[in-house]
Amino acid sequence: MRLTELALRRAGAADLEEFQRREGLYPSGQEDILTMQRLTPLLLGYERYMVKPGDTYYRIATARGTSVRAMLTANPNQNPNLLIPGQYLNVPYGFPVVPADVPFSSELLQICVQGLLVRYPFLSQKCIARTAWGRPVTALRSGQGPRCALYNASHHANEWITTPVLLPFLEQYASA
């Protein structure tokens, strides 16, 4: 499955033209810049939202199909009782970042990592190596305690098996 197809499925659109019409874009059926800008948040699992006068976490969460808890997690340095019009918030969507039913690619892995880091800012990322093709080998970390556990996935020849198991596990752990 292509990334565009995943984003369209998450948007509930049958094809690009339907999505473009719904978004008020010219329905060309092509992956143009404006269309991809609107589809990208659906892949990342969150959107950047500019606060408007009268907004509350509850109103924003309800309008976007998410929870106040998810917004609090994604915006740890924001005071939910002091929203200032014009400031930006990360608003997680009400679905998991990590798709459970699509084949993983290096590109999809990096998109999932980006989304997880924003939705769960207590996670951190480090590039520990590069593949022969120059792609990053990413390590994700949660917590800072004295105990350490390593879970390994997305390594050569097994990424299609291990990544779809480990990443949803990490997302469930982070959201707990």
Please annotate each region the language model reported.
Residues 2, 10-14, 18-176:
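M14 metallocarboxypeptidase catalytic domain recognition
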